[in-house]
């Protein structure tokens, strides 16, 4: 019998793989990946054809630390969404594929998506 912690992490990994098997990022339409931990939020634009991160923002970045955006809440998530949209526009990207990973499209994940849409990204 496996521990509940091992089972929980295994199920989380399976959910992420289930979502990602249908999502592929390309140079013209990268994958917008959202990862949240117990303390922080990470948002990345990823080109899966070459396996490279094109742009990223998080609650750990210097810009957000100087502005006091270090907490993990919905307001900060929306700001991160608008920041990643600005970085995407600097790279001449306007369309992305949204990757929620193993998380429900609810709360922080949906606020990142709303912020990115308000910033001009389409998905």
Curated annotation (Swiss-Prot):
Q: Name one GO cellular component term.
A: cytosolic large ribosomal subunit
Please report a single Pfam family linked to this protein: Ribosomal_L18p
Into which family does the record put it? Belongs to the universal ribosomal protein uL18 family.
Protein function: This is one of the proteins that bind and probably mediate the attachment of the 5S RNA into the large ribosomal subunit, where it forms part of the central protuberance.
What is this protein called in UniProt?
A: Large ribosomal subunit protein uL18
GO BP, one example? translation
Gene3D superfamilies, per the entry: 3.30.420.100
Which terms does the record give in the GO molecular function aspect? Answer: 5S rRNA binding; structural constituent of ribosome
Q: Which UniProt keywords apply?
A: Ribonucleoprotein, Ribosomal protein, RNA-binding, rRNA-binding
Instruction: State whether it acts alone or in a complex, and with which partners, per the record.
Output: Part of the 50S ribosomal subunit; part of the 5S rRNA/L5/L18/L25 subcomplex. Contacts the 5S and 23S rRNAs.
Does the keyword field hold Ribosomal protein?
Answer: yes
Q: Which NCBIfam families match?
A: L18_bact
